């Protein structure tokens, strides 16, 4: 059955509704076609019917039929915390603190650069990076040589780069945040974006902003902030009050 799910994803270009309808209508398949596509896979995966499929994804809207990954999928069985923005050396102590509290640190690949990834690797911090294009990870020999696959995981709903760019942010957001996982923001400039991201999820998500100072928050419009459906759980933690 797992092979069939993978085949349907590939056949229907990872479009959730099309895959769902094909399965519901019991679309005819040729087992030879299934096997031909299956052997082309160059990465690991777990499907929605696999016991290692992340539990939190069962509760999101349109849960992924499969996730493709490089690294340790068991990290999803631990408590996660979503980090918005890039990592800089000055934030390392906070990341170490979170890791010491047994949190797995989760990032979006488009928001974390090579320097940030290197900081995670060099300091042996457990992390998950969500990417639209897993092929760029699989083809990065330099990165694969550096990582400890027991303490990290790169994941995507798509393993074929041809379809990665057309993927909408909604799908990536519900995959990244899930339901109830706390969010930490190190870059206060990203706050405008986070409003829309969280509003899509329809769930209570605690959000914490680690800010250098309060100046950038003096002109925030409260009506805008109330777009965050968990407004009362929004907290700003200032490193230096000035």
Label each residue range with its predicted role.
Residues 1-50:
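Short, small/acidic-rich helices and loops at N termini and domain boundaries
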Residues 49-242:
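Glycine-biased, small-residue-rich flexible motifs in mid-sequence functional cores and linkers
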């Amino acid at each position: 059955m797992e092979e069939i799910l993978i085949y349907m994803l590939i056949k229907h270009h990872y479009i959730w509704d099309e895959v769902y309808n094909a399965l519901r209508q019991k679309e005819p398949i040729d087992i030879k076609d299934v096997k031909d596509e299956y052997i082309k896979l160059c990465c690991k995966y777990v499907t929605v019917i696999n016991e290692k499929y992340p539990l939190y994804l069962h509760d999101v809207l349109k849960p992924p039929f499969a996730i493709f990954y490089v690294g340790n999928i068991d990290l999803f069985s631990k408590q996660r915390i979503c980090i918005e923005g890039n990592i800089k050396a000055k934030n390392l102590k906070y990341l170490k603190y979170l890791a010491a509290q047994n949190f797995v640190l989760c990032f979006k690949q488009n928001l974390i650069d090579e320097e940030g990834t290197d900081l995670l690797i060099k300091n042996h911090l457990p992390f998950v990076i969500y990417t639209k294009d897993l092929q760029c990870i699989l083809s990065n020999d330099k990165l694969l040589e550096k990582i400890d696959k027991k303490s990290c995981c790169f994941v995507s709903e798509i393993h074929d780069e041809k379809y990665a760019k057309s993927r909408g942010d909604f799908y990536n957001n519900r995959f990244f945040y899930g339901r109830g996982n706390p969010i930490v923001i190190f870059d206060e400039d990203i706050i405008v974006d986070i409003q829309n991201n969280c509003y899509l999820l329809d769930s209570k998500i605690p959000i914490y902003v680690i800010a250098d100072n309060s100046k950038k928050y003096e002109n925030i419009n409260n009506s805008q902030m109330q777009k965050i459906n968990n407004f009362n759980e929004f907290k700003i933690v200032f490193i230096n009050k000035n």
